[in-house]
Amino acid sequence: MDTRRLRGNPPIGRFRRPRRISMAPQPQKPRIVMKFGGTSVGDVERIRAVAKRVKREVDAGAEVAVVVSAMAGTTNQLVDWVRDTSRFHDAREYDAVVASGEQVTSGLAALALQEIGVSARSWQGWQVPIVTDDAHGKARIARIDTAEIEKRFQQGMVAVVSGFQGLGPDNRITTLGRGGSDTTAVALAAALKADRCDIFTDVDGVYTTDPRIVAKARKLDKITYEEMLEMASLGAKVLQIR
């Protein structure tokens, strides 16, 4: 092959060695679901404290979804209003009213995060959507479509999700029953393939009974899954049996 140089060109028959481009995968960000109950979000000051706690995880590089309950006492007030209005209430309208407490909390939490420089937006259960069966007042989650939340994670945004609620097959709001916000958090963590699900309460561990009621309640250093499930089946609020 003639390898004589042509003016302005490299020698014919010679090839430059290609540059090596690193194709190493980027490290995956940890993904966390954080659930805050009614006492933790009981007023605006506590919601601000929650926002600061979430910001610490965001600053550490995590993708965060927050699940919130209604502010303490709100759901009971909503239930009372329903019963005062109608003795024989429609279960679908009952759910529409009772689920509104979480809507307020999620919006306030998103605003509190934005106030301290964290990109965030709120989602109601039907917006995600969290799809349930049609058992109003005690619905079970069938599936969660996480596509929109995951897209927002890519934009560096925190997702604040209203717990305790979903979307039934009749396109109506459903509620999940007692402990429904815990159920939302665990189900969302599973759907997002989260690294962990943190459930925040105003009690610093697992006790033999509620220490806020029984002064002699004993804190348990260790507990098996079987013991935890038995406690939940007997009514303990530390774990949602569903």
Model-found features: residue ranges?
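Nucleotide/pyrophosphate-binding catalytic subdomain
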Residues: R19-R242
